């Protein structure tokens, strides 16, 4: 397999991760195979259209990383940002202006770009002379952090003087929450230090892959800064969801009971109009690195 084809095949793992996340059912408050959760402006097919619109750009992200691997992280970020804006426009066109994957597009631009850059310096992985290991995933995330660390300084350092604030900027001013920019600029610690170790351990149990993913989703809901929930319900609602997810996870239910409980919890979050979209995004990123490491 030639290098360009290999890079394309690896970018498809990001597409695959989004498809796995979409197909995962039942997901409390989220769009899945059975219902639209807390969303009245999107459904399963909206997400499919969105994923298809982003797929060509995922391939470009990893190619840009490969091409500019000798450039500075800041230079690489700027190239990826240009592509990311184009990808976002394609997404909005495909979904009739519904925001399905804006956050995950940002993260995959960084992480696929970082993957391409890392592969250019580790040809043995492209040549399949060795497998991706956890240390490779960690280094890729650290590179993404180097590429985006300026975001906090540039975007949030003078935010108090801005007139028109984004919701993320308002959260930063009011609560000190740095959201996706903060997570990225630190090299995705929630992914490398929590999500991936948890999921690797779940996969060792040899249980149904969907059950492992559902447990991962619950686990992510217990700790991440989920701006989707905060935006819809405020800080108290977010904290309550964290506690409820923790309680459900600690029950360690057998598969059929877990799905029953998640179906019930889906109705609860839907009634509250709450959607843990941040957890869903981090689940997709976890799946991407799990595919790279050939864990699933």
From Swiss-Prot:
Record bears the keyword Nucleotide-binding: yes
Keyword field: ATP-binding, Nucleotide-binding, Transferase
Pfam hit, one: CitG
Record flagged with keyword Ribonucleoprotein: no
Enzymatic reactions: 3'-dephospho-CoA + ATP = 2'-(5''-triphospho-alpha-D-ribosyl)-3'-dephospho-CoA + adenine
The protein's Enzyme Commission number: 2.4.2.52
GO terms of biological process kind: prosthetic group biosynthetic process
Any one GO MF annotation of this record: triphosphoribosyl-dephospho-CoA synthase activity
Family indicated by similarity: Belongs to the CitG/MdcB family.
Protein name from the UniProt record: Probable 2-(5''-triphosphoribosyl)-3'-dephosphocoenzyme-A synthase
Source organism: Streptococcus mutans serotype c (strain ATCC 700610 / UA159)
Organism placement in taxonomy: Bacteria, Bacillati, Bacillota, Bacilli, Lactobacillales
Underlying gene: citG
